[in-house]
Amino acid sequence: MKDSEFHALVEGRYQFIEQAIDNCDTDIDCELNSGVVTLTFVNGSKIIINKQEPLHQIWVATRENGYHFDWKDGKWIDNRGGRELIELLSDACSKQSGEKVTLG
């Protein structure tokens, strides 16, 4: 994959995440700054999402764990657990907010 394709895929996913957070009923602050998305919850916990250009990966840090996502078959898939990015983020947001969150 070329770097330009990677950046376009990541930016598209970041836009989707921002829109999904804005549309959910749970109070989550979503901030994009210098290629890093920070989700901040009322309890002060955070989820950090950033891109790793040299590896062509998206990395996610939650309160419980860290995840590395590769682009496979049209989806961002965790390279250890095999979960899709938005599915994993929905579960992580639910755990950190204490409310059911569905992002996709």
Swiss-Prot record:
Record-linked InterPro entries: CyaY, Frataxin/CyaY, Frataxin/CyaY_sf, Frataxin_CS
Keyword Hydrolase among UniProt keywords: no
One cellular-component annotation, GO: cytosol
A molecular function GO annotation: ferric iron binding
CDD domains xref list: Frataxin (cd00503)
Homology family: Belongs to the frataxin family.
The protein, known as: Iron-sulfur cluster assembly protein CyaY
Protein's organism: Tolumonas auensis (strain DSM 9187 / NBRC 110442 / TA 4)
